[in-house]
Amino acid sequence: MTTLAIDIGGTKLAAALIGADGQIRDRRELPTPASQTPQALRDALSALVSPLQAHAQRVAIASTGIIRDGSLLALNPHNLGGLLHFPLVKTLEQLTNLPTIAINDAQAAAWAEYQALDGDITDIVFITVSTGVGGGVVSGGKLRTGPGGLAGHIGHTLADPHGPVCGCGRTGCVEAIASGRGIAAAAQGELAGANAKTIFTRAGQGDEQAQQLIHRSARTLARLIADIKATTDCQCVVVGGSVGLAEGYLALVETYLAQEPEAFHVDLLAAHYRHDAGLLGAALLAQGEKL
């Protein structure tokens, strides 16, 4: 059975056909609409899936935000242009006439990355560092989503009580500091207004402020990982996302994690499926996992 998998992120929308063998075909991308209206997202999703839906038997969505009862509830609305609520499952069922499931994108990615690991590993945490910071937890070989879908939203744990206000309403969240949006928001002077990609480029060219911003992000993530180890005693942490997979970033995180007491050390791995982990995880869950 072929699954039409969709990944909804703060920067881009992706879709692909994924067979029972896990092979990705006909991958497509569109930018996430900047508009705050549900109609803009519906129109973008329609354009994304219309060339693919005739070749699929079901739809599986991995989306940023809390997924509850098939709807997207934005914990940080800034990541989706201010969109607070969107009926994901209902919308895709109307667009495709196919049975549809939905799950948080980082939770989906955690499940895909877990499947790629050795069989003796039962406990992992996946962290995506991209437009925002998200996570997914696999404990005892089971994906933990929580009764309200909030499990794994580790980007909204406290990093600095005197830090910037996060879009979720809290102050000093990991996401407000370590994410691509957080890196860009802290830029000043010549870098003011630059996005995270530009800041990484400037860091590679030796720009001191750009390097400091990236170190700040990596240090914040390392402290989060130490907290995660203390909370879950996971066997490894897998890091993905456009920032998490940027050249040299994971090595920086490892350097800062090594400065923590040894009890809080844990193996760090780059995401095996790179930017396709959410798509694959959603498809895998559609094949047999009850959500």
Curated annotation (Swiss-Prot):
Gene Ontology molecular function: ATP binding; N-acylmannosamine kinase activity; zinc ion binding
Which residues are listed for Zn(2+) binding in this entry? H156, C166, C168, C173
**The organism sits in which domain of life?**
Bacteria
Reactions listed under catalytic activity = an N-acyl-D-mannosamine + ATP = an N-acyl-D-mannosamine 6-phosphate + ADP + H(+)
Describe which pathway this protein belongs to, using the record's wording.
Amino-sugar metabolism; N-acetylneuraminate degradation; D-fructose 6-phosphate from N-acetylneuraminate: step 2/5
Covalent S-S links between cysteines: none
Keywords per UniProt: ATP-binding, Carbohydrate metabolism, Kinase, Metal-binding, Nucleotide-binding, Transferase, Zinc
A GO BP annotation: N-acetylneuraminate catabolic process
Task: Give the Enzyme Commission number.
Answer: 2.7.1.60
Has keyword Disulfide bond? Answer: no
Q: Give binding positions for ATP.
A: 5-12, 132-139
InterPro entries (UniProt xref): ATPase_NBD, ManNAc_kinase_bac, ROK, ROK_cs
Q: What does this protein do?
A: Catalyzes the phosphorylation of N-acetylmannosamine (ManNAc) to ManNAc-6-P.
Could you say which protein family the record assigns here? Answer: Belongs to the ROK (NagC/XylR) family. NanK subfamily.
Q: Subunit notes for this chain?
A: Homodimer.
Q: What is this protein called?
A: N-acetylmannosamine kinase
Please give the organism: Escherichia coli O127:H6 (strain E2348/69 / EPEC)
> What's the name of its gene?
nanK
